[in-house]
Amino acid sequence: MLDKDRVLSKLDELDSYLSELESVMPKSYEEHVSSIEKKRSCERLLHILIECVIDVCALMVKGLRLGLPSEEEDLFEKLERKKVISKEMKERLKLMRGLRNILVHRYAEVDNELVFESLGNVNDFRKFRKEVSSFLRKLEAA
């Protein structure tokens, strides 16, 4: 059974971290690269936000009994098939997961331009929240 309270709690966490990120986001690329503190804060908050999104996805897949995912990307596929998230959001989540892997595992030296560009996509977190919340409301109405 889907634990809506837990999902909503995670979505509230998402909002909190998003506010934090927006409070430290640089206004320009130059500001981003010139302040190691800002740069690292943004990287870490992006990482936490993406982990939060993945947690919500895992809770939804488990709670809706959509089957065991073979990998994280499978979470997104299952949620799109169930119409929890849109196809566009599924693709955005795949990109987020890729960024998370770069930030965490440092597959390559973290590209300042990639991180700065990702900061311009913070609205994706709001869209994700909106899509999940909308699905939860539909479940309640059913």
Q: Where in this protein do the model-derived segments appear?
A:
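Solvent-exposed interaction patches of small proteins and small membrane subunits
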Residues: M1-A142
